[in-house]
From Swiss-Prot:
GO cellular component entries: cytoplasm; cytoskeleton; motile cilium
Name of the protein: Cilia- and flagella-associated protein 300
Family: Belongs to the CFAP300 family.
Lineage, opening ranks: Eukaryota, Viridiplantae, Chlorophyta, core chlorophytes, Chlorophyceae
Keyword line: Cell projection, Cilium, Cytoplasm, Cytoskeleton, Flagellum
PANTHER family, per database record: CILIA- AND FLAGELLA-ASSOCIATED PROTEIN 300 (PTHR31078:SF1)
Biological role: Cilium- and flagellum-specific protein that plays a role in axonemal structure organization and motility. Plays a role in outer and inner dynein arm assembly.
Compartments where located: Cytoplasm; Cytoplasm, Cytoskeleton, Flagellum axoneme
Pfam families: CFAP300 (PF14926)
InterPro entries in the cross-refs: CFAP300
Gene: CFAP300
Amino acid sequence: MTAFVPVSLPSTSALNDAYVKSQLTKWDLLRNLRCVAVRYTKYYHKLQGQELLADLFRDEKVQEAFQVLRKGGAWGQLGGPVTKVDATLLASSLTRMDLFDKLTETSPPIVRSNGDIGKCMEDNREGFQVSDQLRELILVEESEHAALFSEAERDELLWRLFEHVVLGGACCQFEDKVEPYVETSKRLYKELVCAQKDPATGKVQTVSAVYKINSIQGDSGPLELYPSRSRQNFCYAAVDPVRRIVKILYHAYVPYW
């Protein structure tokens, strides 16, 4: 029988880091962000990720620890027995930050050599203000830089986290320079993804499996994960098979109006 035990995040966690918390507060992400760490005892093969997630979210202790934001603004449990978890395995193999080099190497650059983010004509897409070329890259399909990053690159967990911090919450205070976005994305990524050196090759490689939780089913249908629809709603479950820890990173977007 599997035992799941919620544990506290250590003081060294990125979510307890003063810099990260300050940036997430500035971008209006911290107030509706939660991270739950859970130890598990049963061995799961890497192909049994869906089984692990189903067992995880069915566990009573996990259901007590993992809470979601309701429409009224209160936090609460999922509200029913879990019958199925629909999740997508994400790419999380990156061990370097050179993915972001393209932002300065393209012509014209999205990010200038001094780190400044280029500005653009103001627009509004999906409820988000677009006033710089970084947000335009993320939100505007017809942007001249839309093809700069491939679909596979945009599916990488590191890029997903980067998008989340760039877009922020409803009261986000934008950055003029790219560095805070990149640095915070890196720290969150390292929080979720465990890396080890391969003894055979000497190369550093990731060992974690990270899943995007699409929906959680109950007896009578989907259980409500978020108070409203938004691309800034996310729930990631990062499985560290070495230490047998799952970290669930959850955020719910609440519109200002």
